[in-house]
Amino acid sequence: MENIPNDVILLIGDHLEDRGDCYNAVLVNSRFHALFSRALFRSTALKNLTQLQLFMKAIVRQPSLASVIQCLDLSRWESAPAQSFLDADELAQLSIWAKSVSRSEEEHIQWEQDLLKGNEEAWIALLLSRANNIRQLKLAYPRENNYLDQIFDRAVNSGRQPVQCHGFLRLEEAYLSHMEDDESKGSLSPAQLLPFFRMPSMRKVDADTVIEPATSNGDSGRETDIQAEEDPTQCSSITDLTLNSSNAAQGLESLTTLCPSLKSLKYQHSDDHALASGFQPTSFFTSLATRKLTLETLWLDNLGTHHAFTASGLNESYDGYFGSLADFTALKDLRIRLPNLLDVGYTFEPSTPLPEILPSSIERIYIESCKENSLPMLISQLQLVLEARKERFKALKRVDIEGFFHVDDEDLDDSGADGASGTRERVIKERVLEMAQPLRNGCEDTGVQLYLRDRACAQTMVEV
């Protein structure tokens, strides 16, 4: 074994498919530890409790391995029973670690019992409490969670209680999703995200299904903003915030006001949740009022779902006007629904022309939810932008228009059917293409790319 070159040993390691064998290879001898530990533990993906327990077994034997972890992926988790691979001494060490992050003996005992029962969340949280050098985290939350919230909260508030939970000082990116079960996946509240906003190195948070409830206290977000200004430690270093399939009744004010350097906000609205409220464009405008000088990317939707009725009743707000973007002087990438972009109301023309709404910094405009009967108006407004490109919109490079432009199934002739399967591929109507041709010509003349999209036409939704 001593005569085998390191390159050959590493090549053998590349062919170890079983995660348990990989983690055990680190423990063979000091040479194997030096060769495999950093490469294997630096970026780790765990998909079930069995893999996690084997991983923790290696860390119990070599505690220094926990500090090697930089990228931890727990996002593709599959719940399944696991047989414990740890002996009594190893379990005792896990109990000691659980005690170090518990605030009471009762809590420690419960955590110890949950570890023995194979509670997946208890195991995941204990691993996270040891990973003190992590840079990137991808995590799927279980439907019910207690330990994870405790670990994250105590990591940023450890001074309040004598617990040893000082991790996440180097965490830069967090991707938060949810485990699927037979019923439905869970959700997160803005309060559950707040610990990530207080981690000193955090730059990017990407979360699924965040539900921000409506409240009668409209000053809560502004109070947060005032506190952040008075106490710099309340400010977050986050520059990129992405929320998918979420429902923000207050425009995320409690989060955005904590981010003085926010450069990117990507929000996908969904009315599919039990406690959903309709999209509130004016709330977002208010919450982003203090970020006009920093925002470079603003997505106020991304093929979201909007219903005429929600749990709150008739949805009267989702087609409301967002407001002028002219003062967002750093904005380069805008994605927004047509009713929120232009204040059309009950007229056929907007109250304010599009060139007066857009900032001169704009590079890309992606306009969603354009109905066919609104397309002529939108085309005329975009033509005004093209006419002003040389003087005001020199940075404009691309325009995307997404809407309801496809040929109905009953209008498709036999030539549009697949002879083998009988399926029909939806296409954009010919008259829509003809209607958009003058705009396309204008874009070509000015060096701007134009894309027509319809979410029912798969070939048009491919990102270029």
Regions found by a protein language model. Give the residues of each.
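Conserved beta-strand positions
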Residues: 13, 46, 74, 139, ...
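Leucine-rich repeat
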Residues: 31, 37-41, 63-71, 84-292, 305, 311-317, ...
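Short amphipathic alpha-helices and their capping/turn segments at secondary-structure boundaries
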Residues: 50, 55-71, 192-193, 251-255, ...
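Structural motif corresponding to alpha-helix initiation and N-cap regions
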Residues: 6, 49-53, 59, 121, ...
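Leucine-rich solenoid repeat modules
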Residues: 12, 302-306, 310-464
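Acidic-and-aromatic substrate-binding clefts and catalytic sites of carbohydrate-active enzymes
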Residues: 44-56, 182-184, 213, 245-247, ...
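Hydrophobic regular-secondary-structure patch
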Residues: 2-87, 136-158, 184, 307, ...
